[in-house]
Amino acid sequence: MDYKKIHIPVMVKEVIQLLNPYGGIYVDATLGCGGHSLAILKRLSPDGRLIGIDRDESAIFYANRILDDSRVILRKASFSHLKEVLSELNIEKIDGIIFDLGVSMLQLKDFERGFSFHSEERLDMRMDQTEPLTAWDVVNKYPEQKLTQIFRDYGDEPFARRIAREIIRQRGKKTIDTCKELADLVKKTVPRHGRLHPATQIFQAIRIEVNREFEELRQGLLQAVELLNSGGRICVISYHSGEDRVVKNFFREEEQKGNLRILTKKPLLPSLEEVAKNPSARSARLRGGEKI
């Protein structure tokens, strides 16, 4: 797979303006293919350091191709292990950190990973392939009530109960094995509005459940603020209301505690020019804060 053809980092200019990297230690907590890391490196001083972290082994592999620099260290880990990873590197404090949330294009374009509507591969959606829970388990083993709750809480899906009932009915005949089977089931069950595929929010909800994304995000944000030096900055890009709500509430709580100064009273949005070049950026929301 040629990552250069599929990966366009989102809101790079705005992230760099907020982080304002130069000297010190910076962390890209969602390495992906290394787009944001590369932009940070271009601004980083010769004695600066950049730590790239991702729970996806393939992200580490691809990022290694473009981040061949003595200032860079890459590690496979989830948000909740942020402090542990840095401790192993004898790093107690950092000067900036970026979180670019959600699924990466690298994962979406790899049909074998089971993230795409069109994939004929088995339902998977694990960002970390060593984790036991898969999308297949959620779809074929969870009871109706739990499916409904996940679809509502993580996907803001108005037809959550109807879709959950149809999944239960269908799997009574045969297991739902592939992403395409699930996408087709949802498409037949609910009306389509606009250009968005009707299964978009369902896939999002299942992915969040499989990867414990909200729990990991809260842990990552907590550890990040603890690790920041005074004046250090945190940037978070989210792509749907649930993620953004977690980030917004966390920033407010930390501001009330006197730990953080919010730099973005309202989230920054991608420019019309960026969205035209990279449609996947259209739902991005960027929030930033500075450690007090």
Curated annotation (Swiss-Prot):
State the Gene Ontology terms under molecular function. rRNA (cytosine-N4-)-methyltransferase activity
Q: Which SUPFAM superfamilies match?
A: Putative methyltransferase TM0872, insert domain, S-adenosyl-L-methionine-dependent methyltransferases
Q: Which domain of life is it from?
A: Bacteria
Entries under InterPro entries matching the protein: RsmH (IPR002903), SAM-dep_MeTrfase_MraW_recog (IPR023397), SAM-dependent_MTases_sf (IPR029063)
The compartments listed are: Cytoplasm
Q: Which GO terms describe its biological process?
A: rRNA base methylation
Which class of enzymes does this protein belong to?
transferase
- State the disulfide connectivity: none
Q: What is its EC number?
A: 2.1.1.199
Q: Name one GO cellular component term.
A: cytoplasm
Task: Report keywords, A-Z.
Answer: Cytoplasm, Methyltransferase, rRNA processing, S-adenosyl-L-methionine, Transferase
Name the principal localization, coarsely classed. Answer: cytoplasm
Give binding positions for S-adenosyl-L-methionine: 34-36, 54, 81, 100, 107
The reaction(s) annotated as catalysed by this protein in its Swiss-Prot or TrEMBL entry are:
cytidine(1402) in 16S rRNA + S-adenosyl-L-methionine = N(4)-methylcytidine(1402) in 16S rRNA + S-adenosyl-L-homocysteine + H(+)
The protein's role, per its UniProt record: Specifically methylates the N4 position of cytidine in position 1402 (C1402) of 16S rRNA.
> Which family does the similarity line name?
Belongs to the methyltransferase superfamily. RsmH family.
From the Swiss-Prot or TrEMBL record, give the protein name: Ribosomal RNA small subunit methyltransferase H
Q: Which organism is it from?
A: Thermodesulfovibrio yellowstonii (strain ATCC 51303 / DSM 11347 / YP87)
Name the gene behind this protein: rsmH
